[in-house]
UniProtKB/Swiss-Prot annotation:
Pfam families: Ribosomal_L5, Ribosomal_L5_C. This is Large ribosomal subunit protein uL5. Disulfide bonds: none annotated. The keyword RNA-binding applies.
Amino acid sequence: MSVVDEETRRKILEDWESNPMRKPRVGKVTVNIGVGESGDRLQKAYELLQELTGQKPVYTRAKQTNPSFGIRRGQPIGVKVDLRREQAIEFLDWTLDAVDRELHESQFDEFGNVCFGLEEHIALEGVEYDPEIGIFGMDIAVTLERPGFRVMRRRRCRRPVPRRHRLTKEEGIVFMEEEFDVEVLP
């Protein structure tokens, strides 16, 4: 039982078959660990993310001062890393296994992108608990795009991508169900 009705699904799949430039792909996967404080715990999150992804993370900084949480504006409070191409697809496949390949319709935005979280990094297959590091949760954001989206990001001759070439929520759901064998729950 899918969230997208069969008629809409059929139209979307026919559209992708007739024009390969309309078939979506994974643009990037962003993995974020929000620690909420700087110091030793943030450094451990940095090392964990580097170990899980094989890439060097960047620190995310506080946007504003909040004395009740003990953070100042500009202070590093989290780490994130962007994965692209094959590395992104492999990591996404690995993390989807940790959530039993189930996503909710509310996790998709209007442009077909999807975000989900892991409460504990040890839910990932092959990752063991290390008392030195502790347990961290993480957010995984998947950005879907069609071929040709570079037009709106490139430096020269930048142009907007028309509404008809952007992804919809339904297309994002169908793509995740078809490519990653995900069950989308209402």
